[in-house]
Regions:
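Thiamine diphosphate
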Residues: 1-144, 197-198, 326, 330-351
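Flexible, low-complexity linker and terminal segments
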Residues: 2-19, 220-351
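Short catalytic-loop micro-motif centered on adjacent basic/acidic residues
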Residues: 35, 108-110, 184-189
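Conserved active-site and cofactor/substrate-binding residues in soluble primary-metabolism enzymes
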Residues: 40-45, 57, 88, 92, ...
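Short internal beta-strands
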Residues: 62-63, 135-139, 307-310
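Glycine-rich ThDP/TPP pyrophosphate-binding loop and its adjacent helix/strand module
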Residues: 117-118, 125-133, 138, 142-284
Length: 351
């Protein structure tokens, strides 16, 4: 993988967060993606979200697969743990890492090729097992590294840069995430940082499987007329169901809303998610209604963005498996294997 080190020099007056870190402390190496790639905007949003959340870089683990999207973890959080897996296998690696050490914050970064094709089964099982993570897909509808073939999320009827039409129906990763049990589901647009950063902050703070599908136009192969993943198309067909402000209880934040236009959602760590309702009838706590709404708007040619679903009582894999409080990778051999006498007691209890 191409690597360009970023100079460590920065202006001494850069703002610092509650831990004394600047944005530069959350950056990685210099991006080698195409100039104007939407993925770089997502990386910048992740940097902002972690800065605002006062996350200690060493407490976060970033994992990815293969593709343009999976290169991006090299461009943010250079002081964090990282693992670049094989194509489509990131969810399994993340699941294993989470089982071994639940004290880390897990961020999985993938793409529409990595998650919707070769890694589709991995993605679905990782979500249905309720792994505590934020899973982000950087969705551009094409295979950018191999010159722009349609991916599984490309809409039927969309046109490639070479002029060919896609005749296959698209996989909707948001719809799949809703069906298989994700407890936090959202969609955003790489060009809308005001919406994306609060969603990332909320997803990173969510105690369960959080999924965000980010439409991220490929400027090289899928940003032309006829593409449904281009900057122009998304801006023209973007229907946001809510506007968000994430409030970390460690810092006082004031936001002005007209009475009756917003609702507060308290997260399990005490943080507050304030939703400004742009569609009064939309309820992000109703999974079935969310799926119905998504289908109806898709049929109308609209792209729904914002917080689509939030389970007020999520459970993660460790709660379901009833694992011990301490991380499994800290247990000694004696604790893991108490000896033959303990085994004899277990066998006797089952007779």
């Amino acid at each position: 993988m191409t690597y360009l080190a970023k100079p460590k020099f920065h202006h001494p007056a850069l703002p610092k967060n509650g831990l004394g870190f600047t944005h530069r402390d959350y950056e990685g190496s210099i991006s080698t993606l195409c100039a104007g790639c939407g993925h770089d905007s997502i990386s910048a949003a992740i940097i902002s979200a972690c800065f605002e959340l006062n996350i200690e870089p060493h407490r976060l683990a970033k994992l990815s697969g293969i593709g343009c999207s999976s290169k991006t973890p090299d461009y943010f959080l250079g002081q964090s743990h990282g693992f670049n897996s094989v194509h489509g296998r990131m969810p399994s690696v993340l699941t294993g890492a989470n089982l071994a050490n639940k004290q880390l914050i897990y961020l999985g970064v993938s793409g529409d090729g990595d998650s919707a094709s070769i890694g589709l089964g991995q993605f679905m099982h990782c979500v249905r097992r309720s792994v505590n993570m934020l899973y982000v897909t950087e969705n551009n509808g094409v295979y950018g590294l191999t010159k722009g073939q349609f991916s599984a999320t490309a809409d039927r009827g969309s046109k490639s840069k070479a002029g060919g039409l896609n005749n296959d129906s698209a996989l909707d990763l948001v719809g799949l995430a809703l069906q298989i049990g994700a407890t936090f589901v959202a969609r955003s647009f790489s060009g809308d940082k005001k919406q994306l950063v609060p969603l990332l902050m909320a997803g990173l703070s969510h105690p369960g499987p959080a999924f965000i599908d980010v439409i991220s136009p490929c400027v090289a192969f899928n940003n032309h007329p006829g593409s449904t993943k281009s900057f122009e198309f998304v801006r023209a067909h973007n229907e946001a169901v809510n506007r968000l402000d994430f409030m970390d209880t460690r810092e006082p934040i004031t936001v002005d809303y007209e009475p009756g236009t917003s609702t507060d959602v308290t997260l399990h760590d005490g943080s507050l998610l304030k939703l400004a309702k742009l569609h009064p009838e939309y309820d992000p706590h109703d999974r079935i209604a969310a799926m119905t709404y998504m289908q109806s708007r898709a049929a109308a040619g609209e792209l729904v963005t914002g917080l689509i679903y939030l389970d007020p009582n999520p459970r993660d894999m460790h709660a379901i498996l009833n694992t011990v409080d301490v991380p499994l990778n800290t247990l000694s051999e004696k604790e893991l294997c108490p000896g033959s006498s303990a085994l004899e007691k277990i066998n006797a209890a089952l007779r």
